[in-house]
Amino acid sequence: QRGILTSDNAQAIFIDTPGIHRPHHALDRNMLATARGVVQEADVVLWIVDVSRKPGTDERRVAQFIQQTNESCKVFIAMNKCDLLKPQNVISHSTMYRTLCPEALWMLVSAKRGDNVEIIKNEILDLLPIGPRYYDDNVITDKTVRELSGELLRESALHYLRHEIPHGIAVLIDEFIEDEGDKIEIMATLVVENSRHK
């Protein structure tokens, strides 16, 4: 899924990668291969971390993955959830994340409150190399409304079922009916990786 940000003098294409974790199944391996391909082609990697907690094995794995996959790209660490961080932990937690990617730019951010979001956006645009615009100014995604609906359903399912189904879920849109008003009727099938999750 691509999100397109266009300003007066720049255009950034954001590609959300699958989570980077140790693969156990074919789906995991495919997701990791997809993430690797995206990072290899990236000019800038925006790594969003939860700074309210210390980095663990997963964060170390992601840092290593980024650095080994594309040594030449710039990395920007958005240390999210700074609004949940206890004041006495600001320096220690941010230092731990900066140590994982010493060359990375970084900033504390609260996506919930909007703290530093505009600054990060502008920093990323400044890091991009000169190149052509690939999309018209009014385009914000390469997905159709039908595809976005599937993503929203998957996000909701993962939110409500996150303890039962960590990430192995896909959404197939069976019917997508738009009426003359603002209503859309959607029939979808949720596909899970493991049969015990049905």
Task: Name each model-derived stretch.
Residues 67, 72-76, 82-147:
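Canonical P-loop GTPase G-domain recognition
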Residues 2, 12, 18-68, 87-90:
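Switch II of P-loop NTPase G domains
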Residues 6, 60, 73-75:
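Nucleotide and nucleotide-moiety/phosphate-recognizing core
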Residues 18-21, 51-55, 81-85, 111-116, ...:
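Conserved nucleotide-binding/hydrolysis micro-motifs of P-loop NTPases
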Residues 1, 16, 35, 46, ...:
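Residue-level signature of catalytic and energy-coupling elements of molecular machines
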Residues 11-13, 105:
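Conserved beta-strand segments of alpha/beta enzyme cores
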Residues 4-8, 23, 38-45, 69, ...:
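Conserved, well-folded catalytic cores of nucleic-acid-processing
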Residues 138-198:
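Long, well-ordered amphipathic alpha-helical subdomains in the mid-to-C-terminal portions
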